[in-house]
Each structure stands twice: as structure tokens, then as C-alpha cells.
Amino acid sequence: LGRVGRLAQPMTLGALARALADVLPATAQGVRAAGDFDRTIETVALCAGAGDSLLSDPQVRAADVYITSDLRHHPASEARESSRLRGGPALLDVSHWASEWLWLDTAAAQLRAALPTAEVLVSELRTDPWDFAIV
């Protein structure tokens, strides 16, 4: 699991999804959501990259929302149904590439500090495999 934390101010699931869409680079997938648009979100669990293997993790289950990537149909459907019946997080599914893109500049800065004689570059190549979606 990447991180679990609390938002500075509670917001709705819909507002959080919009905020993510505004911060992440645009992708064909956008931000997919499972849960009540107006649900109040305070506690966030996050896993960059593919994270459906953590859907049953107690920290994820205790959060109001789980933000990750590459959610597969059956694990996401089961988590959604479980959340409706027994409580659990809403889901926000973002592009794998976009979820990892956020930390590249930070990682580069840390590498530059640790290896001052090495040239550290951050690629600007977009590696998201999807070019467009038709809805």
C-alpha cells in the first residue's frame, strides 16, 4: 500500500474525482469512479500502479476511498458490492502511467541529491497505451 491519509477538508467523491482529473495528466481513461457521487470522503488509501491485489487490505477497507490503477472487472465489482453491503471504500481508478507520473520529479530530485555527479533526466514520453475512448 502506498499511503493512507486524511484530507485537509472533507469533500465528496465527485469533487475528489474532479480534483484528481485536474491534477493528473489527461488520458483516454480519465478517472473512473465506483460509489455514490455525493459520498463524503475524509480518509484516502492510495496505491500507485496496479492495486487491485490490495482491495481486501484492512487499511484499504477502512478508508473512505481507494485510489489506484488497473482495476479489473471482477475484483472491482466484488469490492463495490462488498462496500455496499458491509461498508468499505469507494473506488477511483486512474491510468497506471498517470498514477506513477506524479512522483517522477520528486524521485529525480532525490537522485540528483544522492548522486550529484550523475545526470538525471525525467522522460517526457507518455507511456499510457490508450490514445482515445469513445463514450
What are these regions (language model features)?
Residues L1-V135:
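Hydrophobic structural segments
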